[in-house]
Protein backbone atom coordinates (compact mmCIF):
# COMPACT_ATOMS: atom_id res chain seq x y z
CA UNK A 1 0.00 0.00 0.00
CA UNK A 2 1.42 3.38 -0.94
CA UNK A 3 0.18 6.91 -0.41
CA UNK A 4 1.53 10.45 -0.55
CA UNK A 5 -1.39 12.16 1.15
CA UNK A 6 -3.74 11.36 4.01
CA UNK A 7 -5.56 8.13 4.79
CA UNK A 8 -8.80 8.44 6.78
CA UNK A 9 -9.88 5.35 8.69
CA UNK A 10 -13.60 5.23 9.41
CA UNK A 11 -15.34 4.04 12.55
CA UNK A 12 -14.99 0.31 13.11
CA UNK A 13 -12.40 -0.21 10.38
CA UNK A 14 -9.40 -2.50 10.94
CA UNK A 15 -6.14 -1.64 9.20
CA UNK A 16 -4.02 -4.83 9.33
CA UNK A 17 -0.26 -4.34 9.18
CA UNK A 18 0.76 -7.99 9.12
CA UNK A 19 3.22 -8.04 6.25
CA UNK A 20 6.76 -6.79 6.58
CA UNK A 21 6.47 -5.38 3.08
CA UNK A 22 3.28 -3.55 4.01
CA UNK A 23 4.93 -2.08 7.08
CA UNK A 24 7.87 -0.93 4.99
CA UNK A 25 5.52 0.63 2.46
CA UNK A 26 3.72 2.49 5.24
CA UNK A 27 7.02 3.77 6.67
CA UNK A 28 8.13 4.94 3.24
CA UNK A 29 4.95 6.55 2.00
CA UNK A 30 2.19 7.03 4.52
CA UNK A 31 4.50 8.19 7.31
CA UNK A 32 7.06 10.08 5.26
CA UNK A 33 7.14 13.81 4.57
CA UNK A 34 3.69 15.34 4.95
CA UNK A 35 1.84 12.03 4.93
CA UNK A 36 -0.45 11.68 7.95
CA UNK A 37 -2.65 8.90 9.27
CA UNK A 38 -5.81 10.51 10.61
CA UNK A 39 -8.37 8.81 12.82
CA UNK A 40 -11.31 11.09 13.42
CA UNK A 41 -13.70 8.48 14.81
CA UNK A 42 -13.73 5.83 17.50
CA UNK A 43 -13.13 2.11 17.51
CA UNK A 44 -10.23 1.74 15.06
CA UNK A 45 -7.84 -1.20 15.51
CA UNK A 46 -4.42 -1.34 13.89
CA UNK A 47 -3.00 -4.88 13.73
CA UNK A 48 0.76 -5.19 13.33
CA UNK A 49 3.72 -2.93 14.01
CA UNK A 50 3.15 0.80 13.68
CA UNK A 51 6.14 3.07 13.16
CA UNK A 52 5.41 6.78 13.60
CA UNK A 53 8.91 8.12 13.00
CA UNK A 54 7.87 11.01 10.83
CA UNK A 55 9.39 14.11 9.37
CA UNK A 56 9.20 17.11 11.70
CA UNK A 57 6.08 18.56 10.03
CA UNK A 58 4.10 15.31 10.09
CA UNK A 59 1.62 13.97 12.61
CA UNK A 60 -0.09 10.69 13.49
CA UNK A 61 -3.58 11.01 14.94
CA UNK A 62 -4.48 7.98 17.05
CA UNK A 63 -7.46 9.16 19.08
CA UNK A 64 -9.43 6.20 20.51
CA UNK A 65 -7.27 3.73 18.58
CA UNK A 66 -6.06 0.28 19.61
CA UNK A 67 -2.70 -0.81 18.22
CA UNK A 68 -2.76 -4.63 18.44
CA UNK A 69 1.03 -4.80 18.13
CA UNK A 70 4.09 -2.63 18.75
CA UNK A 71 4.13 1.17 18.58
CA UNK A 72 7.44 2.87 17.80
CA UNK A 73 7.48 6.62 18.39
CA UNK A 74 11.18 7.41 18.76
CA UNK A 75 11.18 10.65 16.74
CA UNK A 76 7.63 11.26 15.54
CA UNK A 77 4.52 12.82 17.02
CA UNK A 78 1.43 10.94 18.14
CA UNK A 79 -1.64 13.06 18.81
CA UNK A 80 -4.87 12.38 20.65
CA UNK A 81 -5.79 16.05 20.54
CA UNK A 82 -9.20 16.72 19.00
CA UNK A 83 -10.59 19.36 21.36
CA UNK A 84 -12.25 16.79 23.62
CA UNK A 85 -10.65 15.15 26.66
CA UNK A 86 -11.21 11.48 27.41
CA UNK A 87 -9.80 9.70 24.33
CA UNK A 88 -7.66 6.58 24.73
CA UNK A 89 -4.75 5.12 22.77
CA UNK A 90 -4.17 1.47 23.69
CA UNK A 91 -0.96 -0.32 22.73
CA UNK A 92 -1.20 -4.11 23.18
CA UNK A 93 2.42 -4.66 22.12
CA UNK A 94 5.65 -2.93 23.06
CA UNK A 95 5.96 0.86 23.21
CA UNK A 96 9.19 2.64 22.20
CA UNK A 97 9.29 6.35 23.08
CA UNK A 98 11.55 9.22 22.13
CA UNK A 99 9.10 11.38 20.19
CA UNK A 100 6.16 13.55 21.25
CA UNK A 101 2.71 12.73 22.60
CA UNK A 102 -0.10 15.31 22.34
CA UNK A 103 -3.00 15.03 24.80
CA UNK A 104 -6.18 16.95 25.70
CA UNK A 105 -6.96 17.29 29.41
CA UNK A 106 -9.11 19.09 31.91
CA UNK A 107 -7.00 20.79 34.56
CA UNK A 108 -8.90 20.73 37.84
CA UNK A 109 -8.60 18.26 40.71
CA UNK A 110 -8.15 14.49 40.81
CA UNK A 111 -11.46 13.83 39.02
CA UNK A 112 -10.45 15.74 35.87
CA UNK A 113 -10.95 13.96 32.55
CA UNK A 114 -7.89 13.48 30.34
CA UNK A 115 -6.76 11.60 27.25
CA UNK A 116 -5.01 8.39 28.25
CA UNK A 117 -2.18 6.27 26.85
CA UNK A 118 -2.66 2.62 27.89
CA UNK A 119 0.41 0.37 27.65
CA UNK A 120 0.09 -3.45 27.75
CA UNK A 121 3.66 -4.46 26.88
CA UNK A 122 7.29 -3.57 27.45
CA UNK A 123 8.05 0.15 27.39
CA UNK A 124 11.22 2.16 26.78
CA UNK A 125 12.46 5.61 25.73
CA UNK A 126 11.78 9.18 26.81
CA UNK A 127 8.58 10.75 25.50
CA UNK A 128 7.80 14.47 25.57
CA UNK A 129 4.17 15.20 26.45
CA UNK A 130 2.31 18.32 25.32
CA UNK A 131 -0.91 19.03 27.25
CA UNK A 132 -3.71 21.05 25.66
CA UNK A 133 -5.88 22.37 28.55
CA UNK A 134 -9.48 21.94 27.41
CA UNK A 135 -11.19 23.40 30.45
CA UNK A 136 -10.74 23.81 34.18
CA UNK A 137 -9.90 26.48 36.71
CA UNK A 138 -6.88 24.83 38.34
CA UNK A 139 -7.16 23.06 41.67
CA UNK A 140 -4.85 21.26 44.10
CA UNK A 141 -4.44 17.53 43.44
CA UNK A 142 -3.65 14.53 45.60
CA UNK A 143 -3.55 11.42 43.42
CA UNK A 144 -3.44 13.49 40.25
CA UNK A 145 -4.85 13.25 36.73
CA UNK A 146 -3.77 10.00 35.06
CA UNK A 147 -2.41 10.38 31.52
CA UNK A 148 -0.34 7.17 31.12
CA UNK A 149 -1.57 3.79 32.38
CA UNK A 150 0.92 0.91 32.49
CA UNK A 151 -1.68 -1.86 32.49
CA UNK A 152 0.69 -4.77 31.85
CA UNK A 153 1.72 -7.24 34.53
CA UNK A 154 4.95 -5.73 35.97
CA UNK A 155 6.24 -9.21 36.81
CA UNK A 156 6.21 -10.17 33.11
CA UNK A 157 6.85 -6.87 31.33
CA UNK A 158 9.46 -4.18 31.85
CA UNK A 159 8.34 -0.57 32.22
CA UNK A 160 11.34 1.64 31.42
CA UNK A 161 9.60 4.51 29.60
CA UNK A 162 9.93 8.05 30.94
CA UNK A 163 7.49 10.90 30.26
CA UNK A 164 8.05 14.63 30.77
CA UNK A 165 6.15 17.80 29.92
CA UNK A 166 7.49 19.95 27.10
CA UNK A 167 9.14 23.32 27.72
CA UNK A 168 9.59 24.26 31.37
CA UNK A 169 8.17 20.92 32.51
CA UNK A 170 5.01 22.52 33.87
CA UNK A 171 1.60 23.45 32.49
CA UNK A 172 -0.45 26.22 34.09
CA UNK A 173 -4.14 26.60 34.83
CA UNK A 174 -5.38 29.31 37.16
CA UNK A 175 -3.23 29.70 40.26
CA UNK A 176 -1.58 26.29 39.93
CA UNK A 177 1.18 24.64 37.91
CA UNK A 178 1.03 20.93 37.03
CA UNK A 179 3.87 18.54 36.25
CA UNK A 180 4.14 14.86 35.32
CA UNK A 181 4.81 12.53 38.25
CA UNK A 182 5.34 8.75 38.12
CA UNK A 183 3.46 6.74 40.73
CA UNK A 184 3.27 2.91 40.78
CA UNK A 185 4.34 2.68 37.08
CA UNK A 186 1.62 5.13 35.98
CA UNK A 187 2.03 8.83 35.14
CA UNK A 188 -0.12 11.62 36.57
CA UNK A 189 -0.51 15.36 36.15
CA UNK A 190 -0.13 16.80 39.61
CA UNK A 191 0.08 20.21 41.16
CA UNK A 192 2.56 18.89 43.68
CA UNK A 193 5.53 20.22 45.57
CA UNK A 194 7.92 17.31 45.94
CA UNK A 195 8.75 16.55 49.57
CA UNK A 196 12.43 15.65 50.05
CA UNK A 197 13.17 12.02 50.82
CA UNK A 198 13.51 11.52 54.60
CA UNK A 199 17.03 11.06 55.90
CA UNK A 200 18.07 7.49 56.81
CA UNK A 201 17.61 6.29 60.36
CA UNK A 202 20.62 7.16 62.53
CA UNK A 203 23.24 4.52 63.21
CA UNK A 204 23.52 3.34 65.89
CA UNK A 205 19.86 3.53 66.92
CA UNK A 206 19.41 5.91 69.89
CA UNK A 207 18.85 4.20 73.23
CA UNK A 208 16.31 4.85 74.54
CA UNK A 209 14.28 5.49 71.38
CA UNK A 210 12.82 9.04 71.40
CA UNK A 211 9.08 9.14 72.11
CA UNK A 212 7.94 12.74 71.47
CA UNK A 213 4.78 13.95 73.18
CA UNK A 214 2.68 15.15 71.49
CA UNK A 215 3.42 13.11 68.40
CA UNK A 216 4.24 15.47 65.47
CA UNK A 217 1.64 15.67 62.74
CA UNK A 218 2.81 14.10 59.47
CA UNK A 219 3.85 16.38 56.63
CA UNK A 220 1.09 16.49 53.97
CA UNK A 221 1.88 14.15 51.10
CA UNK A 222 1.14 16.77 48.46
CA UNK A 223 1.52 20.54 48.55
CA UNK A 224 0.06 22.39 45.54
CA UNK A 225 2.48 24.18 43.22
CA UNK A 226 1.57 27.85 42.77
CA UNK A 227 2.16 29.71 39.54
CA UNK A 228 4.80 32.45 39.85
CA UNK A 229 2.31 35.15 38.75
CA UNK A 230 0.43 34.63 42.01
CA UNK A 231 3.46 36.14 43.75
CA UNK A 232 3.34 39.13 41.40
CA UNK A 233 -0.26 39.90 42.38
CA UNK A 234 0.66 39.65 46.07
CA UNK A 235 3.73 41.86 45.57
CA UNK A 236 1.69 44.61 43.91
CA UNK A 237 -0.99 44.48 46.60
CA UNK A 238 1.53 44.76 49.43
CA UNK A 239 3.46 47.57 47.71
CA UNK A 240 0.31 49.62 47.01
CA UNK A 241 -0.76 49.57 50.66
CA UNK A 242 2.72 50.37 52.00
CA UNK A 243 3.87 53.01 49.50
CA UNK A 244 2.53 56.16 51.19
CA UNK A 245 2.69 55.13 54.87
CA UNK A 246 4.46 57.70 57.05
CA UNK A 247 4.95 58.87 60.63
CA UNK A 248 4.47 62.27 62.20
CA UNK A 249 8.03 63.43 61.40
CA UNK A 250 7.58 62.45 57.73
CA UNK A 251 5.21 65.26 56.75
CA UNK A 252 4.83 69.00 57.28
CA UNK A 253 3.12 70.05 60.48
CA UNK A 254 4.33 67.07 62.42
CA UNK A 255 7.42 68.87 63.70
CA UNK A 256 6.68 72.54 63.12
CA UNK A 257 7.64 72.54 59.42
CA UNK A 258 5.94 74.53 56.76
CA UNK A 259 7.07 72.55 53.70
CA UNK A 260 8.44 69.01 53.64
CA UNK A 261 9.89 67.00 50.73
CA UNK A 262 10.45 63.28 51.35
CA UNK A 263 12.16 60.70 49.10
CA UNK A 264 12.12 57.00 50.03
CA UNK A 265 13.80 54.06 48.32
CA UNK A 266 13.85 50.49 49.54
CA UNK A 267 14.19 46.81 48.78
CA UNK A 268 12.60 43.84 50.50
CA UNK A 269 12.35 40.10 50.02
CA UNK A 270 10.39 37.28 51.61
CA UNK A 271 8.98 33.83 50.86
CA UNK A 272 5.25 33.70 50.11
CA UNK A 273 3.16 30.57 50.70
CA UNK A 274 6.33 28.63 51.49
CA UNK A 275 7.47 28.43 47.85
CA UNK A 276 7.47 31.82 46.09
CA UNK A 277 10.63 33.92 46.50
CA UNK A 278 9.47 37.55 46.37
CA UNK A 279 11.66 40.58 45.67
CA UNK A 280 10.51 44.20 45.44
CA UNK A 281 12.23 47.54 44.81
CA UNK A 282 10.22 50.54 46.00
CA UNK A 283 10.53 54.29 45.51
CA UNK A 284 8.25 57.08 46.71
CA UNK A 285 8.30 60.89 46.57
CA UNK A 286 5.99 62.92 48.83
CA UNK A 287 5.50 66.67 49.18
CA UNK A 288 3.52 68.08 52.09
CA UNK A 289 2.79 71.54 53.46
CA UNK A 290 0.89 73.34 56.21
CA UNK A 291 -2.47 74.85 55.35
CA UNK A 292 -3.63 76.11 58.75
CA UNK A 293 -2.29 76.17 62.30
CA UNK A 294 -3.42 77.60 65.61
CA UNK A 295 -3.21 77.62 69.39
CA UNK A 296 -4.85 74.95 71.55
CA UNK A 297 -5.49 76.04 75.13
CA UNK A 298 -2.74 77.82 76.99
CA UNK A 299 0.28 76.55 75.08
CA UNK A 300 -1.04 73.73 72.89
CA UNK A 301 -0.77 73.74 69.12
CA UNK A 302 -2.65 72.18 66.16
CA UNK A 303 -1.90 72.05 62.43
CA UNK A 304 -3.71 71.03 59.27
CA UNK A 305 -1.80 70.19 56.08
CA UNK A 306 -1.99 68.60 52.66
CA UNK A 307 0.16 65.87 51.12
CA UNK A 308 0.63 64.42 47.64
CA UNK A 309 2.93 61.72 46.33
CA UNK A 310 4.06 59.41 43.56
CA UNK A 311 5.30 55.83 43.95
CA UNK A 312 6.93 53.38 41.54
CA UNK A 313 7.53 49.77 42.56
CA UNK A 314 9.07 46.89 40.61
CA UNK A 315 9.63 43.31 41.65
CA UNK A 316 9.83 39.69 40.64
CA UNK A 317 8.74 36.30 41.91
CA UNK A 318 10.66 33.09 41.39
CA UNK A 319 9.12 29.73 42.20
CA UNK A 320 11.34 27.62 44.44
CA UNK A 321 9.60 24.56 43.00
CA UNK A 322 9.46 25.12 39.23
CA UNK A 323 12.14 27.80 38.76
CA UNK A 324 9.72 29.92 36.70
CA UNK A 325 9.75 33.70 37.14
CA UNK A 326 7.10 36.41 36.98
CA UNK A 327 7.74 40.17 36.93
CA UNK A 328 5.47 42.76 38.53
CA UNK A 329 5.25 46.54 38.51
CA UNK A 330 2.90 49.15 39.87
CA UNK A 331 3.00 52.92 39.93
CA UNK A 332 0.51 55.34 41.35
CA UNK A 333 -0.37 58.57 43.09
CA UNK A 334 -1.87 59.68 46.39
CA UNK A 335 -3.39 62.90 47.74
CA UNK A 336 -4.62 63.61 51.24
CA UNK A 337 -4.72 65.66 54.43
CA UNK A 338 -2.62 65.64 57.61
CA UNK A 339 -3.40 66.87 61.12
CA UNK A 340 -1.20 67.24 64.21
CA UNK A 341 -1.87 68.25 67.81
CA UNK A 342 0.73 69.00 70.50
CA UNK A 343 -0.10 69.37 74.18
CA UNK A 344 2.59 72.00 74.78
CA UNK A 345 3.89 72.75 71.29
CA UNK A 346 5.97 70.65 68.95
CA UNK A 347 9.30 71.54 70.56
CA UNK A 348 8.31 71.00 74.21
CA UNK A 349 7.75 68.04 76.47
CA UNK A 350 4.25 66.61 76.29
CA UNK A 351 1.78 64.37 74.53
CA UNK A 352 0.93 64.60 70.86
CA UNK A 353 -1.47 63.12 68.29
CA UNK A 354 -0.90 62.83 64.56
CA UNK A 355 -3.18 61.58 61.79
CA UNK A 356 -3.40 61.53 58.04
CA UNK A 357 -5.74 60.23 55.35
CA UNK A 358 -4.81 59.66 51.69
CA UNK A 359 -6.57 58.36 48.60
CA UNK A 360 -4.21 56.32 46.37
CA UNK A 361 -4.62 54.84 42.90
CA UNK A 362 -2.29 52.53 40.96
CA UNK A 363 -1.74 50.89 37.59
CA UNK A 364 -0.45 47.31 37.93
CA UNK A 365 1.30 44.86 35.60
CA UNK A 366 2.24 41.20 36.09
CA UNK A 367 3.88 39.09 33.37
CA UNK A 368 5.36 35.63 32.94
CA UNK A 369 7.09 34.48 29.76
CA UNK A 370 4.94 31.43 29.05
CA UNK A 371 1.69 32.83 30.47
CA UNK A 372 1.29 36.34 29.03
CA UNK A 373 0.86 39.71 30.73
CA UNK A 374 -1.91 41.05 32.97
CA UNK A 375 -2.89 44.71 33.38
CA UNK A 376 -5.23 45.94 36.11
CA UNK A 377 -5.89 48.81 38.52
CA UNK A 378 -6.11 49.29 42.26
CA UNK A 379 -7.25 52.16 44.46
CA UNK A 380 -8.42 52.98 47.96
CA UNK A 381 -7.85 54.76 51.24
CA UNK A 382 -4.83 54.59 53.53
CA UNK A 383 -5.03 56.35 56.89
CA UNK A 384 -3.18 56.59 60.19
CA UNK A 385 -3.68 57.59 63.82
CA UNK A 386 -0.49 57.97 65.86
CA UNK A 387 0.11 58.98 69.47
CA UNK A 388 3.23 59.63 71.50
CA UNK A 389 4.82 61.43 74.42
CA UNK A 390 7.90 63.60 73.89
CA UNK A 391 10.12 63.43 76.98
CA UNK A 392 13.04 65.87 77.35
CA UNK A 393 15.31 64.58 80.14
CA UNK A 394 17.94 67.24 79.40
CA UNK A 395 21.30 67.66 77.64
CA UNK A 396 19.56 67.84 74.26
CA UNK A 397 18.17 64.32 74.52
CA UNK A 398 14.66 63.44 73.31
CA UNK A 399 13.04 60.11 74.20
CA UNK A 400 9.64 59.41 72.71
CA UNK A 401 7.46 56.27 72.98
CA UNK A 402 5.00 55.95 70.09
CA UNK A 403 1.99 53.89 69.02
CA UNK A 404 0.46 53.93 65.54
CA UNK A 405 -2.54 52.27 63.88
CA UNK A 406 -2.54 52.25 60.05
CA UNK A 407 -5.58 51.45 57.93
CA UNK A 408 -4.67 49.84 54.58
CA UNK A 409 -7.62 49.92 52.21
CA UNK A 410 -6.10 49.92 48.71
CA UNK A 411 -7.97 47.21 46.77
CA UNK A 412 -7.27 45.80 43.34
CA UNK A 413 -10.01 45.56 40.74
CA UNK A 414 -11.26 42.16 39.60
CA UNK A 415 -9.83 41.10 36.23
CA UNK A 416 -9.41 38.15 33.88
CA UNK A 417 -5.79 37.05 33.57
CA UNK A 418 -4.04 36.04 30.36
CA UNK A 419 -4.57 32.36 31.28
CA UNK A 420 -8.34 33.03 31.48
CA UNK A 421 -8.37 32.83 35.28
CA UNK A 422 -10.51 35.27 37.25
CA UNK A 423 -8.42 37.16 39.81
CA UNK A 424 -9.79 39.19 42.71
CA UNK A 425 -8.73 40.39 46.15
CA UNK A 426 -10.17 38.24 48.93
CA UNK A 427 -9.01 40.34 51.91
CA UNK A 428 -10.67 43.76 51.51
CA UNK A 429 -8.60 45.79 53.99
CA UNK A 430 -6.17 45.45 56.86
CA UNK A 431 -5.04 47.18 60.02
CA UNK A 432 -1.31 47.46 60.70
CA UNK A 433 -0.06 48.30 64.20
CA UNK A 434 3.28 49.76 65.25
CA UNK A 435 4.88 50.26 68.64
CA UNK A 436 8.06 52.31 68.63
CA UNK A 437 10.63 54.26 70.57
CA UNK A 438 12.22 57.35 69.01
CA UNK A 439 15.32 59.01 70.44
CA UNK A 440 17.51 61.89 69.29
CA UNK A 441 20.40 63.96 70.60
CA UNK A 442 20.74 67.64 69.75
CA UNK A 443 24.40 68.69 69.60
CA UNK A 444 26.12 72.06 69.53
CA UNK A 445 27.17 71.41 65.94
CA UNK A 446 23.54 71.61 64.75
CA UNK A 447 23.69 67.91 63.91
CA UNK A 448 21.12 65.59 65.46
CA UNK A 449 21.67 61.82 65.43
CA UNK A 450 18.47 59.75 65.71
CA UNK A 451 17.63 56.16 66.58
CA UNK A 452 14.25 54.43 66.17
CA UNK A 453 13.22 50.97 67.35
CA UNK A 454 9.90 49.67 65.99
CA UNK A 455 7.75 46.57 66.23
CA UNK A 456 5.15 45.96 63.48
CA UNK A 457 2.18 43.63 63.62
CA UNK A 458 -0.09 42.80 60.67
CA UNK A 459 -3.12 40.71 61.76
CA UNK A 460 -3.79 39.66 58.18
CA UNK A 461 -1.65 38.87 55.16
CA UNK A 462 -2.07 40.07 51.60
CA UNK A 463 -4.54 37.65 50.02
CA UNK A 464 -5.93 37.12 46.53
CA UNK A 465 -8.44 34.73 45.01
CA UNK A 466 -7.84 33.11 41.63
CA UNK A 467 -10.68 31.04 40.19
CA UNK A 468 -12.00 30.30 43.66
CA UNK A 469 -8.62 29.43 45.21
CA UNK A 470 -7.51 31.76 48.00
CA UNK A 471 -3.77 32.35 48.30
CA UNK A 472 -2.09 34.35 51.05
CA UNK A 473 1.51 35.52 51.17
CA UNK A 474 1.63 34.60 54.90
CA UNK A 475 4.58 36.95 55.19
CA UNK A 476 6.00 38.90 58.10
CA UNK A 477 2.94 39.33 60.29
CA UNK A 478 5.43 40.33 62.97
CA UNK A 479 8.68 42.11 62.31
CA UNK A 480 11.17 44.37 63.99
CA UNK A 481 12.91 47.50 62.70
CA UNK A 482 16.02 49.49 63.55
CA UNK A 483 16.40 52.92 61.96
CA UNK A 484 19.37 55.25 62.36
CA UNK A 485 19.58 58.74 60.95
CA UNK A 486 21.04 62.19 61.17
CA UNK A 487 19.54 65.66 60.77
CA UNK A 488 21.59 68.71 59.85
CA UNK A 489 20.60 72.36 59.64
CA UNK A 490 21.74 74.06 56.45
CA UNK A 491 20.32 77.36 57.69
CA UNK A 492 17.77 78.58 60.20
CA UNK A 493 15.02 77.78 57.70
CA UNK A 494 16.30 74.70 55.86
CA UNK A 495 17.34 71.32 57.21
CA UNK A 496 18.19 67.94 55.69
CA UNK A 497 17.60 64.53 57.19
CA UNK A 498 18.84 61.13 56.09
CA UNK A 499 18.22 57.72 57.61
CA UNK A 500 18.48 54.02 56.90
CA UNK A 501 16.13 51.36 58.28
CA UNK A 502 16.44 47.59 58.47
CA UNK A 503 13.48 45.29 59.04
CA UNK A 504 13.51 41.59 59.79
CA UNK A 505 10.60 39.20 60.18
CA UNK A 506 9.40 35.66 59.75
CA UNK A 507 9.14 33.85 56.39
CA UNK A 508 12.59 35.09 55.38
CA UNK A 509 11.31 38.69 55.34
CA UNK A 510 14.03 41.33 55.19
CA UNK A 511 13.82 44.96 54.11
CA UNK A 512 16.30 47.80 53.76
CA UNK A 513 15.01 51.34 53.23
CA UNK A 514 16.73 54.67 52.76
CA UNK A 515 15.09 58.02 53.56
CA UNK A 516 16.08 61.52 52.50
CA UNK A 517 14.04 64.59 53.34
CA UNK A 518 14.25 68.36 53.30
CA UNK A 519 12.21 70.74 55.43
CA UNK A 520 11.69 74.45 54.89
CA UNK A 521 10.29 76.79 57.56
CA UNK A 522 9.17 80.37 57.24
Predicted regions and their residues:
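Extracellular beta-solenoid/beta-roll
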Residues: 1-128, 132, 137-193
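Residues that define the transmembrane beta-barrel architecture of outer-membrane proteins
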Residues: 117-119, 123, 255, 279-285, ...
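Short secondary-structure subsegments characteristic of cysteine-rich extracellular domains
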Residues: 138-155, 276-293, 422-428
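Outer-membrane beta-barrel and related beta-rich outer-membrane complex signature
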Residues: 143, 273-275, 316-320, 365-369, ...
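Short beta-strand-to-coil "C-cap" segments at the C-terminal boundary of structured domains/repeats
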Residues: 149-151, 190-196, 290-291, 519-522
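Outer membrane beta-barrel translocator domains of Type V secretion systems
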Residues: 201, 207, 211-395, 399, ...
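Outer membrane beta-barrel transmembrane domains
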Residues: 336, 420-522
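Detector for outer-membrane/organellar transmembrane beta-barrel domains
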Residues: 350, 372-465
